[in-house]
């Protein structure tokens, strides 16, 4: 339970309803600007709640920086923001080092969507395909259908090589034959599932994100 300071000691607040009231009352009593410090928030519902407090200054700070993604989205015309991803709608998922089931952005939300695409039933007769490229073992990589390993320094080259296979760049040289073959296979699957495929990158390099 949350703790509430009463005089010189801390006491438990037994319900979150009471805690919400304590926070709301404290914000009203503060009068002026109140600072809310959080990690990056991508949830629309959470943003909606925060927007209800006009005197609230929302500061977002991440122990792990996502500035590369933010700047890439801004440069691409999508605004200086972090998007949300609907993994349940993707038939093909390609991750370039994004541990979306473990530590990347909103893993609880992503795991829920990801699991929907991995279950076969009458409404969903085929399971989504998950390819993963990474420089070290991760929770997400261990769940992939096909996992390709590489040196961390090769992340950018792999992103460019994949883009080249899709017709958008000059292909760099990939020495590892298995890795090069994997890139070609992934690109072919992305093309075959155009409109129902997703590529995410865990890199904090703006150019890789673009």
Question: What residue ranges belong to the model's regions?
Answer:
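Active-site phosphate/pyrophosphate-binding segments
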Residues: 92, 146-210
